[in-house]
Amino acid sequence: MSYAVCRMQKVKSAGLKGMQFHNQRERKSRTNDDIDHERTRENYDLKNDKNIDYNERVKEIIESQKTGTRKTRKDAVLVNELLVTSDRDFFEQLDPGEQKRFFEESYKLFSERYGKQNIAYATVHNDEQTPHMHLGVVPMRDGKLQGKNVFNRQELLWLQDKFPEHMKKQGFELKRGERGSDRKHIETAKFKKQTLEKEIDFLEKNLAVKKDEWTAYSDKVKSDLEVPAKRHMKSVEVPTGEKSMFGLGKEIMKTEKKPTKNVVISERDYKNLVTAARDNDRLKQHVRNLMSTDMAREYKKLSKEHGQVKEKYSGLVERFNENVNDYNELLEENKSLKSKISDLKRDVSLIYESTKEFLKERTDGLKAFKNVFKGFVDKVKDKTAQFQEKHDLEPKKNEFELTHNREVKKERSRDQGMSL
């Protein structure tokens, strides 16, 4: 049986626009190669008929319900995004109509749970390997944005327990996901990252060997090009500035050797030079061949994939650390609440004893006192039930009634002991 998957991600102001680009396919993804753009037209949004501006929609939801005048903090969690999905095998067993019903039932459940007015978007992606829904909840409650209270530890446990249960009731064969799945995803990403690093290291070493071969080959060509050469000199007649003694006005010339733009090398050196030039051409072709090999392409591909996995791994670690921090905060909060509950129970016990003494002093006879006190306890019980019903709370016995029941039980035990 497949697992029901419902993961929550906190989205702050800085990440909202990026979430919009991804969910609505407004920009080509550089990190997700799983997207099949030919199937993007199969995506749809159960909340909106067309693309929206996430910032504007979230602002509308907050402003329409906000009761105070305080501005929203810049680092506040604006959206708690739920990723709703299962594995590929589960969806392959469903026809398109049932796949859509799966997401519609999920949307219906969360709309009722968090309020339809608080759902910013519910985008279903069918253009990736596994269909899934990104459902954005603006965590508004009692006129305030309060993500920590809406999605506290108890609520996250409710999601893990009740979502699979609800979907099973709707006819989908799903079971609850295993605890600690975030850690498992991190370990998987970490393993893939390490595997890629090993492959890249192997390719880098092979490329280093090829580079050494290339350098040695290049040096060889360079040494072959060290050809001894002499300047080519030409004898030319140049004037001396003196005139002939015979007075004919003719200037005296002399012969000098001047360099031309040519050089003279031996026939052997010329042949070596031609060979070196050919070797140089072969070297260039060798480099071109090297750069077009499968190994070079594989190195480039793996380097890119390694960057993507590293980015995903970092994101998972960051999310896991956030969950740990939230968990630690909840632990501290629970300690504080337990302390307060303990104090309140003690106060209720004192009120119970004080009420008991007060009524006892003003009632004649033990039987009459017990009847009056029982009537008082029943009134407290009725008031508690009315309060719970009014505020849609889970029906529970109040602490005053529980204290009374304990006292009655103690009295009965004492009476039984005395009768023995």
From Swiss-Prot:
Protein's UniProt keywords contain Protease: no
Gene3D superfamilies for the chain: 3.30.930.30
Highest taxon of source: Bacteria
Cited InterPro entries: Mob_Pre (IPR001668)
GO-annotated molecular function: DNA binding
Keyword DNA-binding: yes
Residue numbers spanned by region Disordered: 388-420
Residues involved in DNA binding: 44, 114
Keywords: DNA-binding, Plasmid
GO biological process, any: DNA recombination
Other facts: Contains conserved positively charged amino acids probably involved in the binding of the pre protein to the RSA site.
Similarity comment: family membership: Belongs to the plasmid mobilization pre family.
Free-text function comment from the UniProt entry: The interaction of the RSA site and the PRE protein may not only serves a function in plasmid maintenance, but may also contributes to the distribution of small antibiotic resistance plasmids among Gram-positive bacteria.
Protein name: Plasmid recombination enzyme type 2
Upper lineage: Bacteria, Bacillati, Bacillota, Bacilli, Bacillales
Name of encoding gene: pre
